Amino acid sequence: LSILFLTVLSHLGLLGKPFHVYSPSSKENTLWIVKATPKGESLKLEVAEKVKFDFSGRVITAHPRKPLLYVTATGGDPGKVPGAVVFLNKDGSYQKHQNINFNDGACYLSLDTGNRHILGVSYGNGRLNVYPLDEQGIPGKAITTIDEGKKEAHCVLLPPDGKNVYIPYVKGN
């Protein structure tokens, strides 16, 4: 499997090129931006920056076509769950971030196949929220909230055709 991974990376032209790893730290209320540089068969990791947030970010996803990251907390007051849109430079380094609010804390975020909406599911209450994205990729107020009466939603997945949404519920469901 690792040979296949290296083969794919070399065909994509990524082998040997530095890249960034992004990780929210809920304990420090920061976004860690780590520069990863391939060195032969190893990987050199160095903290490029720690971005301070006003909230405990736990969940992160990237926009597939824009240099944006979406970070959210897993809990908070309904309609005021803190999150942020992180703007990146072309090289993947940090530019700025904008605080936003979500309806519910999310344990998983996904974008629809047209990259026009971000979908979030809550582990705590099981709800799905769908937020429209404006031209810059900033989420607006939720246009749909679905509550099936089940808790512990694990993730929200969409097939390539985008015609369905799959939300597995865990534990007692």
Task: Name each model-derived stretch.
Residues 28-29, 75-79, 124-127, 171-173:
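Short glycine/acidic-enriched loop and turn motifs that connect beta-strands
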Residues 96-159:
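Asp-box/WD-like beta-propeller blade repeats and closely related beta-sheet repeat scaffolds
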Residues 17, 63-66, 113-115, 160-161:
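Residue-level detector of Asp-centered blade-edge/turn motifs that repeat once per structural unit
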Residues 16-37:
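An edge-strand/N-cap motif at the start of beta-rich repeat modules
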Residues 2-11:
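Bacterial N-terminal signal peptides
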Residues 34-42, 86-92, 131-138:
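Short loop/turn segments immediately following beta-strands, especially the blade-tip
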